Regions:
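Short gly/ser-rich loop at a beta-strand->alpha-helix junction or flexible surface loop bordering the NTP-binding
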Residues: 1-146, 259-282
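Surface segments flanking catalytic/ligand-binding clefts of nucleic-acid enzymes
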Residues: 130-282
Length: 282
C-alpha cells in the first residue's frame, strides 16, 4: 500500500479534507494525501487498478526509461473515470508487456494514443541502430491490434538510422515517395541509406567517426565505396555539416540520381557554408 494513498475515510471525511487542501482527488475512488508526482501516481494506479496498464505517451516514456509526466495515459478493458492527471481509454482487447518495472501496452499499440510528434521521437530512438529493423519486425509480428495511422507513421520514419542527419535525409526521401532502407548491407558493408530500386547508396559522416587516424578505418573508407560501385551502385557521401547547412542540395542530388536527372551543383567552395569566412565556427 502506497503511503500517500488515502484509505479508510468516509466520503464526508474525504470531502472535508479536500476542502482543507489536505487530500487531492486524482481519479474516481483514488485520493492522495497532498500532491504526488507522476511516478508515484503510476505506482498507486498499478496497485489500485490491476486491470489498467500504461498507454500512449506514458507507455512510450516507460519503454525509453524516461521520467513519467502528467497527464498519465492508461488503457483498460474496464471503464475508469480519470481526472486532471489521469486519462484512461477503454480497449476491448488488451495485450501488455512488463517494462522497466511497469505494465505497458505493446509499444506499437501505445503509438495509437500518442501524438504524432511523440510517436516519431519514440520510433527514432527506440528502433535506432543496425538491429532496429529486426526489432521492429519482431514487435510488428507480436502486435495484434494497430491502427492505420500508426502503420503510416512507422512507414514515414527512418527506422534503424543511427544519427539525426541520417533521419533528416531518410524522412525527406520518404516524403518524396522513395522506398528507403537504413543500415543496409551491400557486399558485407553497411550503408547509412540505400534506395534499392535505383541502386543508390548514401553515407553520411560525422566529423570524427570516419577519421583516418586508424589504418583499418582508412582502408575501409576506401574499399567500401569501391565494392558498392563494382556492384553497380551509385555512391554518394556527405558530411553531417552538409545536411545541417545544405540539406536541400543533398536531397536534390539523391532524388536527381533516382529520377534520371542528375543534380550538379557548382564546385563546393563556391557555395558550402564551411568555405566561407568563419564557416567552421557554425
Amino acid at each position: 500500500m502506497h503511503e500517500k494513498l488515502v484509505t479508510g475515510l468516509s466520503r464526508h471525511q474525504i470531502s472535508t479534507r479536500i476542502a482543507r487542501g489536505e487530500i487531492v482527488k486524482q481519479a474516481r475512488g483514488i485520493h492522495t494525501w497532498g500532491e504526488v508526482d507522476a511516478q508515484e501516481l503510476a505506482k498507486i494506479l498499478d496497485q489500485e487498478w490491476p486491470d489498467a496498464v500504461l498507454d500512449g505517451e506514458t507507455a512510450l516514456r516507460q519503454y525509453l526509461g524516461l521520467q513519467l509526466k502528467f497527464p498519465l495515459q492508461l488503457a483498460s478493458r474496464k471503464q475508469h473515470a480519470g481526472g486532471v492527471n489521469v486519462q484512461v481509454r477503454r480497449l476491448s482487447k488488451l495485450e501488455w508487456w512488463y517494462v522497466n518495472g511497469g505494465r505497458c501496452v505493446a509499444p506499437l499499440t501505445a503509438l495509437g494514443s500518442a501524438s504524432e510528434e511523440a510517436g516519431r521521437r519514440f520510433l527514432n530512438r527506440y528502433y535506432a541502430g543496425f538491429d532496429g529493423k529486426r526489432r521492429l519486425s519482431q514487435d510488428l509480428a507480436g502486435t495484434k491490434y494497430m491502427s492505420k495511422q500508426t502503420r503510416a507513421l512507422i512507414d514515414s520514419v527512418a527506422i534503424g538510422a543511427d544519427s539525426a542527419p541520417e533521419r533528416e535525409i531518410i524522412t525527406a526521401l520518404k516524403q518524396a515517395r522513395l522506398r528507403v532502407e537504413s543500415n543496409y548491407e551491400i557486399g558485407g558493408y553497411r550503408w547509412d541509406i540505400a534506395v534499392k530500386k535505383h541502386k543508390v547508396a548514401v553515407e553520411i559522416d560525422g566529423y570524427g567517426y570516419h577519421s583516418s587516424d586508424k589504418m583499418e578505418a582508412f582502408l575501409k573508407d576506401h574499399w567500401k565505396p569501391n565494392d558498392a560501385a563494382a556492384r553497380g551502385w551509385t555512391v554518394f557521401r556527405y558530411s553531417g555539416s552538409c545536411v545541417k547547412h545544405h540539406k536541400d542540395y543533398v536531397v536534390r542530388q539523391i532524388l536527381g540520381q533516382c529520377e534520371g536527372t542528375p543534380f550538379l551543383p557548382p564546385p563546393l567552395w563556391k557555395w558550402h557554408k564551411l568555405f566561407r569566412p568563419g564557416g567552421w565556427r557554425g
